[in-house]
């Protein structure tokens, strides 16, 4: 432990009361999550000390019962499928900028994470190849990710190109400052103005749920959402082997979004096509 007087004590002199005292200090500062993290770290340190014969017992054992429980994690509000049309129509009629509207549309059409979306540059976009690539540095798993572009996303990008293209290194969604990109709050505020409690992450949840209900295979959905499984070889296999499946899958999703915004019947999944994709 590094706080309070316990930080200066030899490890053999630290007892349960000393550890609890430090945890109470952290809890009193209003950072309960940090207190739980500190307890976990302390237990690991003391366990190591036991393993090398320095200590006989762990003074941090069972202290988790002395701390209040962590609050339950707040899940990102998911968008229901029947809210997509009203949300998009309200967004289009709102006072949000065309660039912000385009960002939200692409988030819905592609299921990209917030950071991956906001850090995109025009050098990441291949309109002719109907493909968009997110650099490894901008991905949660630090691995480069590519997504097929349905025709709806290509249409959004072509309109956006006229507004924000300043070269391959320029951001798709620039912010107000020099070399800045759009902020998370800008997208969040625009979504709030639609009257729907939803985040870009909630759009990812909708995409996954809906495509699962349509019968598209798990591997294709996991690859599209860039969920990390296995080593780099496994990831390369997932990206390459399921690319044709993802092209079909994401075009179907784009057609669904178009129909919902227009208030028209949602296109049915071609059962035979899905079966072929699942069997491949």
Language-model-detected regions and their locations in the chain:
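Active-site/catalytic core of tyrosine-dependent DNA strand-transfer enzymes
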Residues: 80-85, 129, 138, 148-201, ...
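C-terminal catalytic core of tyrosine-transesterase DNA break-rejoin enzymes
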Residues: 33, 51, 105-116, 182-186, ...
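C-terminal secondary-structure termini that scaffold catalytic or DNA-interacting sites
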Residues: 139, 151-167, 174-179, 214, ...
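Short, polar N-cap/turn motifs at the start of nucleic acid-interacting alpha helices
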Residues: 57, 124-131, 197, 201, ...
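Basic/aromatic-enriched alpha-helical hairpins
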Residues: 1-29, 45-48
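Hydrophobic (often cysteine-bearing) scaffold residues that line and stabilize catalytic clefts
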Residues: 15, 34-41, 80, 99-100, ...
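Basic, Lys/Arg- and aromatic-enriched nucleic-acid-binding interface segment
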Residues: 26-41, 51, 55-120, 128, ...
